[in-house]
């Protein structure tokens, strides 16, 4: 019985690693809100945007991945040309690492909330990206 429980525990611990992979990355985090020209109410694919959504480059962060900031967790569901081109990182970055950083655009329902969050957080920060098996398929 002990052997069965030990084997089951080991199998489950390895299975969890197969379904989720964590990595950290330096990111230039920007904000957007409805009516800013993009994200009026839906993401590029028609999905309704929520506060816990963000825009990413899908070649670097698969859709459905969790992006974990110091104080929040967002799901990658949207994209945009400035995110893919990394315009914010290239224009604001002072070091080569900052200029090569990925760009993540956090969605907020209100402009005031977005600007308040942006003003209290650094422009560049380390984020944790958790890509699940569903996100990588």
Residue ranges and their predicted role:
Residues 7-15:
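Bacterial N-terminal signal peptides
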Residues 19-137:
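Solvent-exposed, well-ordered loop and adjacent helix/strand elements within mature globular domains
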Residues 1-4:
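Positively charged n-region of N-terminal signal peptides that target proteins for export
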């Amino acid at each position: 019985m002990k052997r069965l429980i030990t084997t089951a525990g080991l199998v489950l611990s390895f299975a969890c690693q197969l379904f989720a992979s964590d990595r950290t990355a330096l990111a230039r985090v920007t904000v957007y809100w409805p009516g800013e020209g993009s994200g009026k109410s839906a993401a590029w694919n028609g999905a309704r945007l929520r506060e816990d959504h963000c825009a990413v480059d899908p070649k670097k962060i698969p859709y459905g991945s969790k992006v974990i900031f110091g104080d929040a967790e967002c799901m990658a569901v949207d994209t945009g040309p400035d995110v893919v081109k990394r315009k914010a990182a290239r224009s604001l970055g002072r070091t080569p690492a900052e200029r090569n950083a990925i760009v993540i655009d956090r969605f907020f329902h209100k402009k005031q909330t977005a600007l308040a969050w942006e003003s209290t957080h650094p422009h560049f920060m380390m984020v944790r990206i958790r890509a699940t098996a569903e996100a990588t398929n």
